[in-house]
Every structure is written in structure tokens, then in C-alpha cells.
Amino acid sequence: MERQNPIEEARRYVDNAKQTLKANGEYDSALKRYGERKYVKSAGHFLWTGMLVLLDALFPVKTKQRPHPDIKDYKDAVAQRDRKLLALVSDGYATMHIAMGYDGNQQKAVCDAGFRLADEIIKICSKMLPKQQNP
């Protein structure tokens, strides 16, 4: 099976997250929050997974002691190449993965911040990928 372009795949994850909130989120405009925590959690997991697709494509992280890399491994790899991206990845981890994905923070401002960070990370990563991987 041919490996999909990481930028397109990350965008697909972002679209899935948007669709999850749009279709199931039951947004309350008076409270400026989504009604169901489980859909915010799903959207957060979609967003963060999309970012991991990009990070894995740009910064293949190998660990000797653990079977899977953790956020510190990604931050260390990103820090060597781009400090702005490091700040976005740190904020994205806190917003998409922790606040949305685990805590299920239902505030629209938090969810909007997660989508904004995802878009910024994709934008920077698209400039870093070789032309054959970036349409």
C-alpha cells in the first residue's frame, strides 16, 4: 500500500475532527461550549493524531528504552530544527492532546485554539517536507 502524503493525511485528520464536532458537538452559543465531552475528546484525539503523522514524517524518533516515543522525544527532535515549531508543538500537545483529548474541555475557545494550532503546525511542516511529499 502506498504511503499517503503526510500533509494531506494531517489535513484529513483535521477535517475528521471538525466533522465530529459539527455533526455531534451540540454547540451552545449562549454558554460558548460544546454539549458532549466525548465528542470534544474524539476531536482532540483526531487533531493530535494528525500532528503526530506530520512529526513522524519530519522527525523520525527512535527510542531505545521505550517501544513508542513520548512528547519529550518529539520536542527534543523539533527543538534542534525549528524553535517556532517547538512552541506550536508544545502548545498543541497541551491543547489538542491534554485539554481536548483527555480532559474533554468543552469551551469553544479551547477547541478553536486546537484547530488554529493544528493549521499553523501543518503550514510550517508543509514548508519543511521535501517536494515529492508535499504537493
Question: Residues of each region from the PLM?
Answer:
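Hydrophobic alpha-helical packing segments in soluble, helical-rich domains
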Residues: Y39-K62
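Short, charged, amphipathic alpha-helical segments
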Residues: Y34-R37, K41-S42, K108-D112
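Long, charged low-complexity segments
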Residues: L55, F59-P135
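Generic, low-specificity signal for short hydrophobic/alpha-helical stretches with a mild N-terminal bias
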Residues: G25, K32-R33, K41, M96, ...
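Charged alpha-helical initiation segments
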Residues: M1-R37, K127, P135
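Alpha-helical scaffold segments in carbohydrate-active enzymes
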Residues: N16, T49-V53, E120
